[in-house]
Amino acid sequence: MESRYYHAKNVFIDSIEIDDYIALDSSVISYKQLQHSIEKPLKMILVFGRPGTGKSILLNYLYENLKYQKDIHYFATPTTNEEEFFHKIFKVITKKNLPSNTRVNFSTLVDYCRDIQGKREIVVLLDEAQMYSAEMMERIRLLSDSRSIKFIIALHKTDQEDLIAKEHFQSRIWEVVELRNGTLEDTQNYIHKKLLKKNLFEIANSIKSYHIGLIYKFSKGNYRETNKILFTIFEIYEYYDLHNKNKIDENSFSKKIIEMAAIKLGFIHV
C-alpha cells in the first residue's frame, strides 16, 4: 500500500525541471531582470548566488521560455575538457559538427563570430561556471567581445568565485543578477505552492506559520536546504504511516517530526 506521504516527499526532490519552477515574488523579479538584460547590448551577464538559491532552475526556465524565439543554448552540465567544450561552442556558432578528432581553431572561430556580427545574436547559458578553468573563461570572454555571442554565466557566490568574477569579467559584465535566500514569506509560499501544485491540499493546509518558522530557522530560506528538510520530514511521515500509524496525526503537522528531520540532517546536534 502506497502512503500519501510518498507523493509529498517526492515533491521536494531537488530538480531544475521546468514543471518544478515555483513563481515567487523574488524569483519573478530575477527572471524579469534577466529577460530584460538579454535585450540590452551586453556581452556578458552574471547570475550570482549561493548554492541552493535557484540559479539552475532560473536558467532552465529562461531557456524553455525563449528557445523558440531566440538563438539560445543551455549548457546545464559543465564540460571541463576544453576541447570538448569548444566543439560544442563551434556547433552552436557554425551549426556544423567537427569530426571528433579535429581541434577547434580558436582564432578562426573568433573571426567567424566577428563576421556574423549583426546577422545573428547567439545567447549561451552556462551553468556551474565555477567548474570552468581560468583559461576557458578567458576564451569565453574573447568570444563575447565579438558581440555576436552573449554569455549568461551562473556562478556560485563564494569568496573564490567572487575573485574569479572580478578578475576575469570585471570590465566586461554590465549586468549582475544576484539571487539570495528566500524570506520567511518566500519559504511559506514555496512550500505551500509546491504541495498545492500536486493537489496535496490537506497536507499543505496542515503546515501552519509556526511550522514554517521552524523550518526556516534551519534552512535560512535556502531552497535546496528547504527541499532536504521537507523531503526528510515526509520520509519520516511515510515510515510511520506504513509501519506505526498511531504515532502520527494526519490532521496536524508535527513539530516533533520537523525536529527529527533536523536531527537527521545535522541541523540539531544531540
Question: Which positions does each model-derived feature cover?
Answer:
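Conserved catalytic segments around the Walker B and adjacent sensor/switch elements
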Residues: 66-79
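Conserved P-loop NTPase "ATPase switch" module shared by AAA+ and STAND
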Residues: 19, 112-136, 140
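Conserved NTP-binding/hydrolysis module of P-loop NTPases
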Residues: 7-15, 19, 80-100
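Central P-loop NTPase core of STAND/AAA+ ATPases
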Residues: 94-118
